[in-house]
């Protein structure tokens, strides 16, 4: 597709609209504006045109403005307060500053489209300009009521350290890498971290490129409020009924909720069974005063489910060696004596909780630093001063539904 063909045929440059659905209302809350070119037989995405740095900037800006104006004309025709998501290249945006992008928005503001309906989607991964200038401009747009969305999160090029500094309104997370439930745990952990970050800075999570129900369930489970992708609706020339997927989403979410409730109940039952088992084992071996001897007895009882045992005091200092299950036998790792683990997330909080409730705690799934496997840890109060930690093996988690 030649750039000049597009520039000399702007009449056939058109906006397409991809609906964005909400978790709380189960309906369309806005549209992302996407550029298309009609060549006489099919509609061709203008994405490659806009991202081709060999095409002069003024040409790309001109076509961008045509798509934007035609899209805003369409939004003027409908009497609904829908959000308008607009993509902009950070370099082009800054080189033109607020002219002509802001001029168009102000022009349509006078026609009835308030600035608080716009969401500017921007990716700064390949931005070559001064970050301070970009920050200043984006903050200025926010003072006008325009929302800022950081795009392309979930890619390797994501600058996660910049999110807190920019404090965007929306984090837009790409789920293309999560096309099956075999996607790496590391990728899923990064997305989970993004959901925590969004909560901390008061941003809304929007998950895009949802192409299958598994991705929708992941987005829902990880705090996604907005959803977008071919599984829900493809980009089209026309707007859709806001409630087009209301029944479908309600049905899907009911399944997600039922599955999650069952998973939570399973975890509760497993935690209770661990609690009862540990009460029996502690009572059985309570006469063993030396912790290494006590842990040695536990290895015989827990050989099929655990690979590491150790005991810490209430401040996180290890008061026993590790008993670690190697390839064929349990070994004592005395070098771990007196190490302190209070820096670990939730460590002291969990110690306090166990001391008050006098019950054990089953951790979330996490990747063990030393062996690299996904594991869980069951922590159990031996007294108000000392606490037992049992690292459960991946094989055990894999063999028990709901633990992974």
Locations of regions flagged by a protein language model:
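Active-site core of bacterial EAL-family cyclic-dinucleotide phosphodiesterase domains
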Residues: 1-52, 366
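The catalytic core of metal-dependent phosphodiesterases that act on cyclic dinucleotides
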Residues: 111-179, 204-220, 226-232
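Catalytic core of bacterial c-di-GMP phosphodiesterases, primarily the EAL and HD-GYP domains
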Residues: 62-133
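Intrinsically disordered, low-complexity terminal regulatory regions
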Residues: 2-7, 14-15, 51-58, 77-83, ...
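A short beta-strand signature within small-molecule sensing/ligand-binding domains used
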Residues: 13-17, 361, 370-380
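Contiguous mid-protein beta-loop-alpha structural module that forms a pocket-lining wall or clamp
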Residues: 186-266
């Amino acid at each position: 597709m030649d750039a000049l063909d597009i520039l000399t045929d702007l009449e056939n440059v058109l906006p397409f609209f991809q609906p964005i659905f909400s978790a709380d209302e189960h309906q369309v809350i806005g549209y992302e504006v996407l550029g298309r070119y009609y060549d006489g037989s099919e509609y061709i995405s203008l994405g490659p045109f806009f991202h081709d740095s060999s095409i002069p900037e003024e040409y790309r800006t001109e076509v961008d403005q045509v798509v934007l104006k035609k899209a805003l004309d369409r939004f003027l025709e409908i009497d609904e307060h829908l959000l308008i998501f607009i993509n902009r290249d950070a370099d082009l945006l800054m080189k033109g500053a607020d002219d002509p992008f802001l001029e168009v928005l102000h022009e349509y503001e006078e026609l009835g489209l308030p600035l608080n309906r716009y969401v500017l989607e921007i990716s700064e991964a390949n931005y070559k300009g001064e970050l301070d200038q970009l920050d200043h401009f984006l903050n200025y747009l926010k003072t006008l009521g325009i929302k800022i969305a950081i795009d392309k999160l979930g890619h390797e090029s994501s600058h996660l350290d910049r999110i807190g500094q920019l404090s965007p309104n929306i984090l837009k997370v790409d789920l293309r890498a999560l096309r099956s439930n075999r996607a790496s745990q590391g990728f899923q952990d990064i997305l989970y971290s993004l959901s925590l970050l969004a909560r901390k800075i008061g941003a809304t999570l929007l998950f895009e490129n949802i192409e299958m129900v598994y991705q929708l369930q992941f987005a829902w489970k990880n705090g996604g409020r907005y959803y977008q992708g071919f599984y829900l609706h493809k980009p089209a020339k026309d707007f859709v009924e806001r409630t087009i997927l209301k029944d479908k989403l309600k049905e899907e979410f009911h399944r997600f909720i039922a599955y999650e409730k069952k998973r939570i109940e399973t975890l509760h039952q497993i935690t209770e069974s661990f609690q009862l088992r540990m009460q029996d084992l502690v009572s059985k071996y309570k006469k063993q005063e030396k912790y290494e001897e006590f842990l040695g007895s536990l290895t015989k009882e827990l050989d099929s489910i655990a690979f590491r045992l150790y005991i810490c005091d209430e401040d996180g200092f290890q008061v026993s060696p590790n008993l670690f299950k190697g390839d064929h036998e349990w070994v004592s790792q005395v070098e771990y004596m007196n190490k302190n683990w209070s820096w670990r997330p939730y460590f002291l909080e969990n110690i306090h909780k166990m001391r008050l409730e006098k019950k054990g705690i089953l951790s979330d799934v996490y990747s063990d630093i030393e062996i690299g496997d996904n594991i869980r840890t069951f922590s159990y109060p031996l007294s108000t001063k000392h606490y037992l930690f049992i690292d459960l093996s991946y094989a055990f988690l894999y063999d028990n539904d709901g633990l992974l």
